[in-house]
Curated annotation (Swiss-Prot):
Keyword terms of this UniProt record: Disulfide bond, Ion channel impairing toxin, Knottin, Secreted, Signal, Toxin
Places the protein is found: Secreted
Organism: Cyriopagopus hainanus
Propeptide, chain numbering: 22-74
Taxonomic lineage: Eukaryota, Metazoa, Ecdysozoa, Arthropoda, Chelicerata
UniProt region (Disordered), positions on chain: 61-82
Protein name per its UniProtKB record: U11-theraphotoxin-Hhn1q
Domain text: The presence of a 'disulfide through disulfide knot' structurally defines this protein as a knottin.
A Gene Ontology molecular function term of the record: sodium channel inhibitor activity
Length: 113
């Protein structure tokens, strides 16, 4: 009976001591993994930040180009009176004195080239 108790006590002590070692190992292993995970997350975060900055730069560049060229200056369309000294006819049009039907208006009009 004593041998059974001693054996049981010995197995119990071994199990507890080995279990403690495993627990400490597990804790250290988890700390290492979390540190590696943090470094991986930092790397991923930096990579994402770089991509976002590139996209933002492209968008701002497009916005600045768009705002600079977005609206054509007001121009006069075809068949509309214009001033011969300051013609503001749209591109592809020329400010000319009318022929035939517009002679009595005594004004210049925008016509196609």
């Amino acid at each position: 009976m004593n041998t059974v108790r001693v054996t049981f006590l010995l197995v119990f002590v071994l199990a507890v001591s080995l279990g403690q070692a495993d627990k400490d190992e597990n804790r250290m292993e988890m700390q290492e993994k979390t540190e590696q995970g943090k470094s991986y997350l930092d790397f991923a975060e930096n990579l994402l930040l770089q991509k976002l900055e590139e996209l933002e730069a492209k968008l701002l560049e497009e916005d600045s180009e768009e705002s600079r060229n977005s609206r054509q200056k007001r121009c006069i369309g075809e068949g509309v009176p214009c001033d011969e000294k300051d013609p503001r006819c749209c591109s592809g049009l020329v400010c000319l004195k009318p022929t035939l039907h517009g002679i009595w208006y005594k004004s210049y009009y925008c016509y196609r080239k």
